[in-house]
Amino acid sequence: MSRFSGALQLTDLDDFITPSQECIKPVTIDKTKSKTGAKITVQEDGYYEESEESGKQKLQKVEITLQDCLACSGCITSAEGVLITQQSQEELLKVLRENQKLKATGDNDLVQTIVFTISMQPILSLAHRYQLSVEETARHLSGYFRNLGADYVLCTKVADDLALIECRQEFVERFRDKEDLTMLSSSCPGWVCYAEKTHGNFILPYIATTRSPQQIMGVLVKHFLAEKFNVPGSRIYHATVMPCYDKKLEASREDFYSEVNGSRDVDCVITSIEVEQMLMEDERSLSQHEPVDLDWPWTDQRPESMIWAHEATMSGGYAEHIFKYAAKELFSEDTDNELKFKQLRNRDFREISLEKDDKTVLKFAIANGFRNIQNLVQKLKRGKGANYHFVEVMACPSGCINGGAQVRPTTGQHVRELTQQLEELYKKLPISQPDNSHTKAIYGDFLDGAHTDKSHDLLHTSYHAVEKLNTALNIKW
């Protein structure tokens, strides 16, 4: 287990963001009048019972929800070991079965519209696992989810594009306002959760307010598509397929609960590993499911392909895209060629600069993995981080392509080797540019234009420092 420093307690945290095995959330115990002679009995099936002279009563089971995880300063990253009842493949399959029954019995007033959104990283992971092309994998996944009961299966392309546009505009506005704070990317929930719980009010002003592609997709599905399909957002069930467990926590944030719809923008998150498990339980390979094209409900004109890559990194391409945009917008410098990032401590910490008139006018960095994040935060605390104007921050080494819930390497294969193979698959994909007719149409048809109050309200969020718990339960002896 890797640790940041002796002053920090990190619960079973290592650089690969595996779920914490211990929960240190204190349970509130209601004090009652002292009683004697009581006996607690545990039955074989796990039933707890307290017996006393006045009779027997079943004891309440301690439950921990995802909201508890977000409000607790104990763990830092994901918490698979707790009772994640609303964010599992079991819950997803239950919802799908119940919806199929409602359709069969004609209870149309209760039937939900089921929408799946698949992120690019799980598509790559499952393509490698089942030895299919990336395009074939996307189509087979679409067919598989439709067979389970999905009405629409989407990719995250349009949300990825909107996230880049919003984030680059936010950076340019901060730069022009002469804010001294380094802007840190916000799409990684593991990083955001760590920042809120460990560094709180110090670090939060640095973080971009742009929502992650998953949560932008949630807004588009529950609001834009709800209007387009004439279906209440409350009757849309939105499931996403993501590369890490922390996306489950992100979807459970109260910031992403819609009072209008009475539901979360993303109802359920499953991961690459969970999709693999579902396929194994069906005893059918992914390739055995009928291929079906992904849906494109956003505009009348369907793009030639919905499987695209972004420049430079497998985590959205924030650093490279925003660097190129800012160089042109702020300094009239064209940087159309592929950028050459300089490796620093390791391959997960890189930087790039723009020089003009013998002066460094832009300096960006990419910091992947908690070791590099810790070094970055310490620089900011010492006042040395201002050298960077923007940093793309991802909790996992190598970024989202190596997410903690991606399909595991085969026996004898090293994680680094698998990651390199996934990177090669990614590099073969066509490059997507966010400025296209589809994003322009969404801004015009749904968001009242770019950089409007509505677009800011729906595509941005806020963060909350989590007060540290003073409990002896998180002390290691």
Curated annotation (Swiss-Prot):
<feature type="binding site">
    <location>
        <position position="400"/>
    </location>
    <ligand>
        <name>[4Fe-4S] cluster 2</name>
    </ligand>
</feature>
<feature type="binding site">
    <location>
        <position position="75"/>
    </location>
    <ligand>
        <name>[4Fe-4S] cluster 1</name>
    </ligand>
</feature>
<keyword id="KW-0479">Metal-binding</keyword>
<dbReference type="GO" id="GO:0046872">
    <property type="term" value="F:metal ion binding"/>
</dbReference>
<dbReference type="Pfam" id="PF02906">
    <property type="entry name" value="Fe_hyd_lg_C"/>
</dbReference>
<keyword id="KW-0004">4Fe-4S</keyword>
<feature type="binding site">
    <location>
        <position position="396"/>
    </location>
    <ligand>
        <name>[4Fe-4S] cluster 2</name>
    </ligand>
</feature>
<dbReference type="InterPro" id="IPR009016">
    <property type="entry name" value="Fe_hydrogenase"/>
</dbReference>
<dbReference type="GO" id="GO:0016226">
    <property type="term" value="P:iron-sulfur cluster assembly"/>
</dbReference>
<keyword id="KW-0408">Iron</keyword>
<dbReference type="GO" id="GO:0051539">
    <property type="term" value="F:4 iron, 4 sulfur cluster binding"/>
</dbReference>
<feature type="binding site">
    <location>
        <position position="188"/>
    </location>
    <ligand>
        <name>[4Fe-4S] cluster 2</name>
    </ligand>
</feature>
<dbReference type="InterPro" id="IPR050340">
    <property type="entry name" value="Cytosolic_Fe-S_CAF"/>
</dbReference>
<feature type="binding site">
    <location>
        <position position="69"/>
    </location>
    <ligand>
        <name>[4Fe-4S] cluster 1</name>
    </ligand>
</feature>
<feature type="binding site">
    <location>
        <position position="244"/>
    </location>
    <ligand>
        <name>[4Fe-4S] cluster 2</name>
    </ligand>
</feature>
<keyword id="KW-0411">Iron-sulfur</keyword>
<dbReference type="Pfam" id="PF02256">
    <property type="entry name" value="Fe_hyd_SSU"/>
</dbReference>
<comment type="similarity">
    <text>Belongs to the NARF family.</text>
</comment>
<feature type="binding site">
    <location>
        <position position="72"/>
    </location>
    <ligand>
        <name>[4Fe-4S] cluster 1</name>
    </ligand>
</feature>
<dbReference type="InterPro" id="IPR003149">
    <property type="entry name" value="Fe_hydrogenase_ssu"/>
</dbReference>
<comment type="function">
    <text>Component of the cytosolic iron-sulfur (Fe/S) protein assembly machinery. Required for maturation of extramitochondrial Fe/S proteins.</text>
</comment>
<dbReference type="InterPro" id="IPR004108">
    <property type="entry name" value="Fe_hydrogenase_lsu_C"/>
</dbReference>
<protein>
    <recommendedName>
        <fullName>Probable cytosolic Fe-S cluster assembly factor GK14772</fullName>
    </recommendedName>
</protein>
<feature type="binding site">
    <location>
        <position position="23"/>
    </location>
    <ligand>
        <name>[4Fe-4S] cluster 1</name>
    </ligand>
</feature>
